[in-house]
Swiss-Prot record:
Its main location: cytoplasm. Belongs to the WD repeat STRAP family. SMART domains: WD40. WD repeats lie at residues 12-56, 57-96, 98-137, 141-179, 180-212, 221-262, 263-302. This is Serine-threonine kinase receptor-associated protein. The keyword Nucleus applies. The lineage of its organism: Eukaryota, Metazoa, Chordata, Craniata, Vertebrata. PROSITE patterns: WD_REPEATS_1, WD_REPEATS_2, WD_REPEATS_REGION. Residues 335-350 have a biased composition (Polar residues). It comes from the Eukaryota. The gene is STRAP. It comes from Gallus gallus.
Length: 350
């Protein structure tokens, strides 16, 4: 029988966590960046949640954060009317890009040479990072503040969302190709390169659209208002979180709810799958990030599954070893409905 989820809690932020993003898989693993209203985006090891560093320099809430594919650069969008580009290895601030209003979204091209931004001034800006002093290319057409702006996988198109509209733009002509109107305010948007799928959430709806045409593929209705959703890299399942503090996991093909569980102590603002699909991260109003296993009970990262030899699971104990010298023996808890045992995971202190 199924074992319960045991999330790894990553503390360190002092205000709500509003955005997060993973890098691609690098020779050193993959990495996770989080944006927070405390104005201090943080970088972590993606599979363990271990804190690596904090990017210091913004003077207001940070609304958006991203990493390039090889995790050498980070970009952040903030309420101080700036977007910043950082050296993700040293933590140094490389470029500050001034805007005329709050910046909500940032995204690198595949080669990391250009940065796309969007925010409250309703304009998309494209910066050539080799010429940061040059004026950016500006794309206008949104009628309200931009919540999310993303490149397509070939960087030839741009996808952006404002209040109740998602727009598709041609990069070469800087013109709108198509607009998609939805019934309620868009709360999140994710681009999935495999299959060119756009995941959009609004109200209780989780909708999947072609990123090339904006035609709807399918949609699911959740029991509560959803703030964010993420599709597994292999499109097996999806996760979503929202106002009821719960995470929901669905079968992508059938729409069947596979799991639902609480772990946060406030509304969930953002969820994302890791690039290998083994875990997903969630960020909440409670100021924490939590990492969850896609396959509960699998040994991965800091999770270690031990199946007891004896039938009495309550007597079973196990051991989780943390990276480096930080070993900590922690109590094992038996699943209420299973003889298997799962590890409770230690809180990672930033």
């Amino acid at each position: 029988m199924a074992m319960r989820q045991t999330p790894l809690t990553c503390s360190g932020h002092t205000r709500p966590v509003v955005d997060l993003a993973f890098s691609g898989v690098t020779p050193y693993g993959y990495f996770l960046i989080s944006a927070c209203k405390d104005g201090k985006p943080m970088l972590r090891q993606g599979d363990t949640g271990d804190w690596i560093g904090t990017f210091l320099g913004h003077k207001g809430a940070v609304w958006g954060a991203t990493l390039n594919k090889d995790a050498t650069k980070a970009a952040t969008a903030a309420a101080d009317f700036t977007a910043k580009v950082w050296d993700a290895v040293s933590g140094d601030e490389l470029i500050t890009l001034a805007h005329k209003h709050i910046v909500k979204s940032v995204d690198f091209t595949q080669d990391s040479n250009y940065l796309l931004t969007g925010g409250q001034d309703k304009l998309l800006r494209i910066y050539d990072l080799s010429k940061p002093e040059a004026e950016p290319d500006v794309v206008s057409g949104h009628t309200s503040g931009i919540k999310k702006a993303l490149w397509s996988s070939d960087d030839k198109q741009i996808l952006s969302a404002d209040d109740k509209t998602v727009r598709l733009w041609d990069r070469s002509t800087m013109t709108e190709v198509k607009a998609l109107n939805v019934a309620m305010s868009v709360s999140s948007m994710e681009y999935v390169p495999e299959g060119q799928i756009l995941v959009i959430t609004y109200g209780k709806t989780i909708a999947f659209h072609s990123a090339e045409t904006l035609e709807q593929i399918k949609s699911f209705e959740a029991p509560a208002t959803i703030n964010s959703a993420s599709l597994h890299p292999e499109k097996e399942c999806l996760v979503a979180g929202g106002e009821d503090f719960k995470l929901y996991k669905y079968d992508y093909n059938t729409g069947e709810e596979l799991e639902s569980y609480k772990g946060h102590f406030g509304p969930i603002h953002c969820v994302r799958f890791s690039p290998d699909g083994e875990l997903y991260a969630s960020g909440s109003e409670d100021g924490t990030l939590r990492l969850w296993q896609t396959t509960v009970g699998k040994t991965y990262g800091l999770w270690k599954c031990v199946v007891p030899e004896e039938e009495n699971a309550e007597a079973a104990k196990a051991r989780t070893t943390l990276p480096g010298t930080a070993e900590e023996e922690i109590e094992e808890v038996a699943s209420e409905n299973s003889d298997s045992v799962y590890s409770s995971t230690p809180e990672v202190k930033a």
